Amino acid sequence: GSEGSGDGEFIRPQELAIDSDGNVYVSDRDNNRIQVFDQQGRFLRKWGGFGSGDGEFRWPQGLGIDNEDNIYVSDRGNDRIQVFDQQGRFLRKWGDTGSGNGELRFPQGLGIDNEGNVYVSDQGNNRLQVFDPQGRFLRKWGSDGNGDGEFNWPQSLSIDNQGNVYASDRGNHRVQVFDSQGRFLLQWGTRGSGDGEFIQPQGLAIDSDGNVYVSESGNQRIQVFDPQGRFLRKWGSEGSEDGKCRTPQGQGI
């Protein structure tokens, strides 16, 4: 990738997700499109364009893929979720601007559990919302603040094999963990540059062992933790050379 609007080029790519075939989907935010690549990085297809119609976007952000390889996209500027098949054909959408149940304000990260329920970081409302696969509202939790279960601009979401929900709480410089019903389990992190500290944690991903990978835009690095938040390792520094980062965002495993 490089900066631009051609196939395989990006302007502010945000999140990525990987389907059952190993293909990589990227939300190319400022080009208002989704791009798809094979495991070797070869361009396969794209869809989108600026607008508010079906299949159009205003700053696509979070991505999630269900067990049928349908693609869920948080359409941040349109305050909605859109769903597509693997080829980019529009299937459905839900959401409207507001703070009521099922309404959204700047939706960001997405996570999908084993039952197909969709978890959304409703960033502007400082909460998480949960929907069934058809977009019907199920539950919500969170409010503005820095206490347990409160948020200051929740960013990315990831769900482990037990259904626990991990959220990067960007403005509070921490990660919070909840069960599937929204009950607070644990949190870790504070503002700083040491091991286990964060400056604006962004992307989250969980591997098959339950280890948690967190990208930080402020420290230009990736940190890895065990499921209980114990620091394991890190890599990255600011730059454009191989292995260096500049405002790292989404991750995929």
Per-region residue spans from a language model:
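Eukaryotic scaffold repeat domains enriched in small/polar residues
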Residues: 1-253
